[in-house]
Amino acid sequence: MVKGTTSMGKHGRSKTHIRCRRCGRHSFNVAKGYCAACGFGRSKRIRHYNWANKKVNRIRIV
């Protein structure tokens, strides 16, 4: 019946992320129902951003 520090220890029991069916990465959030890596469950298009890739010599490394 408390909401402070003692209840924070109960968060580590269940799994937050499981393996995604679309991208195969361990990024599918069970509670929210979508993948943090590819966006499965939230959109039909695969989640992709250019800032996620590091640019070396002005050439984007994929």
From Swiss-Prot:
Q: Which cofactor does it need?
A: Zn(2+)
Cysteine pairs bridged by disulfides in the record: none
Q: Which residues form the C4-type zinc fingers?
A: 20-38
InterPro entries given for it? Ribosomal_eL37 (IPR001569), Ribosomal_eL37/eL43 (IPR011331), Ribosomal_eL37_CS (IPR018267), Ribosomal_zn-bd (IPR011332)
Residues where Zn(2+) binds: C20, C23, C35, C38
Q: Name one GO cellular component term.
A: cytosolic large ribosomal subunit
SUPFAM superfamilies with a match to the protein in the record: Zn-binding ribosomal proteins
* Record's cofactor remark: Binds 1 zinc ion per subunit.
Q: Which UniProt keywords apply?
A: Metal-binding, Ribonucleoprotein, Ribosomal protein, RNA-binding, rRNA-binding, Zinc, Zinc-finger
Q: Give me any GO biological process, just one.
A: translation
Q: Which PROSITE patterns match?
A: RIBOSOMAL_L37E (PS01077)
The keyword Ribosomal protein belongs to this UniProt entry's keyword annotation? yes
A single Gene Ontology MF term assigned here is: structural constituent of ribosome
Q: What does this protein do?
A: Binds to the 23S rRNA.
Q: Which family does it belong to?
A: Belongs to the eukaryotic ribosomal protein eL37 family.
Specify the protein name: Large ribosomal subunit protein eL37
Record organism: Desulfurococcus amylolyticus (strain DSM 18924 / JCM 16383 / VKM B-2413 / 1221n)
Per the record, the gene is rpl37e
